[in-house]
């Protein structure tokens, strides 16, 4: 029984990475650019209907909504060779087409104004599913539409589809370069609040690390957005292979998420992938084995989150959970031996209060895509060092806030009217609590962490702001 997943692509970045994702899925399932099953795609065994549905004329249509407040990226998709792939009823571009001006408050406010139109589209897709499992949101946290409207949609999905899983692929800005979006720290912090409270699982796509990997591993001196988006689509398609080519384990989104997230708040995942297909020099000399792939996945240089490779406290940081999705010709006994070797060499430092084991899901490769490697692997991991990424967001926010810089841009919108900046303060508190919780995960007595505060809240003492506490223990 397929468990369908609806994808929401929001904003410029969300639509660009979403487009690459659908290109990759079409290749892997033998679907043409027009949505027609290719003559050679006869092997079966895959579940196309998790991400696609079949129209009356047998075309495969993505279960996707393309949403933006300005038309440029969606126009380019509608004029591309994949223009006949999408359901045109599932495309939303704001009438004025003026965008959100890189302002979270504008994106959020416009989300409120067009909620009915977008929720109608979501409801229609949901009603067309036999057994809807959840939603995937693709967006950036730094701009205006992906962050602001994306935040509004996360809250709306939580209200209307509270029993469905919400997973996000969230692109974090490059922190090594000066951004042309001066209010990026404000946008990021406000979005992080919603990702903490309203998502069940967040796959962090860190542009800082993606650029580093493109330069260091793929030897691309000045990576373009298209090249980093190609890395993102590789991660997205690999992370969904067990749903599309089901095996014994992790063949639905609930199973995938449950195995990785033992505590509800710590639901931010980092990824690693090897071997990267553009590493041409390595193609000739590397023999990919399960041990080689699993060992490389634990190396900092292959992790797609910058905080992992850059922290001084790396020795204290620990894995909360690891799931390796291994694709290709793999003998399960090789997996067992590889796990033993990794354990003997102590290559992964785990938390003390949970199972210190790497979970492995074996997945078939698409028979329609030729790759140079026998075995490839994706690591999805929860790791306490990710808190440094959030700490960086807080410190960048505080630099701007101290100067009271650019706040007038936000005061124009209802949430911040009458100089009410409590939303900023609340968001900062929630993100700081998240940082503290990841830090607490490193200690053996984490299970007791926060109990005193929760006791106070139950008895009516302490923080009564509601928003912070109402979702403790639930995500």
Curated annotation (Swiss-Prot):
| Superkingdom field | Eukaryota
- Binding sites annotated in the UniProt record for GTP: 142-148
Segments for region (Disordered)? 455-475
Compartments in which it is found: Cytoplasm, Cytoskeleton, Microtubule organizing center
In terms of Gene3D superfamilies, this protein maps to: Helix hairpin bin (1.10.287.600), Tubulin/FtsZ, C-terminal domain (3.30.1330.20), Tubulin/FtsZ, GTPase domain (3.40.50.1440)
Keyword check for Electron transport: no
Q: Known Pfam families for this protein? A: Tubulin (PF00091), Tubulin_C (PF03953)
Mainly resides where?
cytoplasm
Key word Transmembrane present: no
Q: In the UniProt record, which is one GO cellular component term?
A: microtubule
Instruction: Return the InterPro entries for the record.
Output: Gamma_tubulin (IPR002454), Tub_FtsZ_C (IPR008280), Tubulin (IPR000217), Tubulin/FtsZ-like_C (IPR037103), Tubulin/FtsZ_2-layer-sand-dom (IPR018316), Tubulin/FtsZ_GTPase_sf (IPR036525), Tubulin_C (IPR023123), Tubulin_CS (IPR017975)
Q: What SMART domains does this protein map onto?
A: Tubulin, Tubulin_C
Name the GO terms of the biological process aspect.
cytoplasmic microtubule organization; meiotic spindle organization; microtubule nucleation; mitotic cell cycle; mitotic sister chromatid segregation; mitotic spindle organization
**A GO molecular function held by the record:** GTP binding
Q: Tell me which UniProt keywords the record has, alphabetically.
A: Cytoplasm, Cytoskeleton, GTP-binding, Microtubule, Nucleotide-binding
Q: Which family does it belong to?
A: Belongs to the tubulin family.
Q: What does this protein do?
A: Tubulin is the major constituent of microtubules. The gamma chain is found at microtubule organizing centers (MTOC) such as the spindle poles, suggesting that it is involved in the minus-end nucleation of microtubule assembly.
- Could you identify this protein by its name? Tubulin gamma chain
Annotated source species: Physcomitrium patens
Its taxonomic path starts at: Eukaryota, Viridiplantae, Streptophyta, Embryophyta, Bryophyta
What gene name is listed for this protein?
TUBG1
